[in-house]
Each structure stands twice: as C-alpha cells, then as structure tokens.
Amino acid sequence: MTHEDLERAALWNSLVHLGPFVKTKWRMDHHDVENQVAQFKDNWCPYNVKKDSHNNRWGLPVTSHTGDVMDNYHLNSFGYMQKYHDVEMKEENFTTPTEVYHAIPEIKRLVDVFAPDIGRVHFLRIDKGGFFPPHRDFHGVSPEYFRLLTVFGRCSPENYVQMVDGKPIYPEAGCVYFANTQLDHSVFSFSDNLYALILTVKLNERTHALIMNNTMAE
C-alpha cells in the first residue's frame, strides 16, 4: 500500500466506526424535492440495464459525463461494465451537472457542499417489485469514494424493506445519511415511487472533516 492508501484507510476507518448508517445534520424538504423531480418524468431510464433484466429500478442523473440528463451510461455497474464490456469507467468522469442539478435547489445546495470532490450523483426510483439484491459497493481497506443517501416518496416501513448488515434500517425522509456500503445491503419495494438520492463523494481530509463535523451532536 502507498502512503496515500494508508492515509485514506485511516480516514475510512474513522468513518465506519461512526456506524453502518449515520444521520447527518443535512436536511432537505423532501416534499419539495419530490414535486420538482416530477418535471423529469420522461427522463428516467432503467437502472443497470446492461447487467440485469429490467426489475422496475430507474435512474435519473444529477451529474453525468456530458451534463446531458439523458447521458445515462454511468447508471450501470462499473464493475460489470469493466469486466464484461471492457469499458473503463471512473467516478470522476461523471461529475458534470445536468439540468436536474440546476432545477432543484435543495439538491444543488447539498452537492455544492462536497464539490468538486464528488463522483456520480443520481436519483433512484424503485417501483413496485423493484429491488437491489444483497451486495457490497466497495472493497478494500482504503476505498477512494463513499456514499451519502437520502430517501423520500413512499418510504414508510410498509412500503419497502432495506437491510444493512442483516438488519432492517429505515432512514428518515429528507435526512442525509452516511452509508457504509461496504456492508452487505439490499432493498425491496412493495410500492411505486420509492426515491433515493445517491451522492458519491471522494474520500479525503476535507470530505472526512465535513462528515465528522456534521454527525456530532450539537
């Protein structure tokens, strides 16, 4: 491991010791976000369509390679694309804001906190019967990126189940969470219109400090 790897491993270790799913101080008006997302109803595309048969998961880019909201190639598994299609895909290649970013102030404010240290940012919509099977997003002791997540829409316990490390977890709508996606996690929706915002963040001293300073009790 390089010195940079060791430094990043120490930062990651301190983050994951906060817990598997940690509420931060960042909040958004989830009703307002849901209403504003509706203007992009024709721009959702099947999520991970290159890898899986369509299972009622949809993606909407907040950032993309070109800034075009229909530039959605990155809404596929990076690992799968690299292994089976010989396409090199990196988080830093998909950070140009789309129309979605500019149209929804609540989202823009959150993304701007972490920019330019971001990777992909996108909405997920999981409709009735849609699911993510148990999986882990990152491997190794010093991942280059981590994930923040917020849910809204039909996100009450009767609408879906989310498992993290073998335990059910139900985030509060509109609250932003640090998620340890190295842990085994999955989700299954019983209803239409379960939404999540996924913000991929580059792990460095600045972003580590942002998380630490915004998860501590006031």
Explain the meaning of each model-derived region.
Residues F152-E172:
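A short beta-strand-loop-beta hairpin characteristic of the jelly-roll/cupin
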Residues S186-F190:
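Asparagine-centered strand-capping/turn motif at beta-strand->loop junctions
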